[in-house]
Amino acid sequence: FDKACKVVQIDIDATEFDKHRNTDVNLLCDAKKGVSALIEGLYGYKDMHADWNKTYSEYRKRCKCKTDIDLKPIVPQKIIYEINRLIDKNDDMIVTTDVGQNQMWAMHYLHVHRPRQFLSSGSFGTMGFGLPSAIGAKAAKPDNTVITITGDGGFQMVQQELATSVAEDLPVI
């Protein structure tokens, strides 16, 4: 954890406070009530990342990486290029990734237009995240097209979830 961050622990059992990590604030309450109170407290909070977000947005506009690369065999950038073409035609599309290089390609090259359009486990290293998260996204947004970008290892860990996708009528690509 970043030493500068403040850690809040919400629990219904006070004996759990500071058990695994020292916290700055302990809230003895139901999680729903505690999170609701925290959210309410954030209203009017100044976005401390506004300057960075503006700089990053300008950087992205200037630094367009070439992804329309026609090589044989096909290269990862070309796959992301084709997915971007689909996203540009279908703004409701949701993309999930597994971990590994496929995740890095997506994070570097994917055009994300809105919040919750790109779902990834980030740096948590959860191999096998891609397909189950795609199925979950489809369950939450059944009218949206959902695709996952995964590798052989991640797919092999959760390939049985294709049966879940079919059984629950939650088609994903």
What spans do the regions from the language model cover?
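Short secondary-structure transition/capping segments
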Residues: 1, 37, 59-61, 144-145
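Phosphate-binding glycine-rich loops and adjacent basic patches that engage nucleotide phosphates
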Residues: 1-4, 39-49, 93-100, 126, ...
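Glycine-rich, acidic loop regions that bind phosphate or pyrophosphate groups
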Residues: 1-55
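Structural beta-sheet core signal
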Residues: 9, 95-97, 148
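Catalytic metal-binding/acid-base residues of hydrolase active sites
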Residues: 13, 100, 154
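Thiamine diphosphate
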Residues: 17-38, 104-173
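Alpha-helix C-cap/termination motif
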Residues: 41, 45, 86-89, 140, ...
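Active-site diphosphate/adenylate-binding microenvironment
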Residues: 57-138, 143
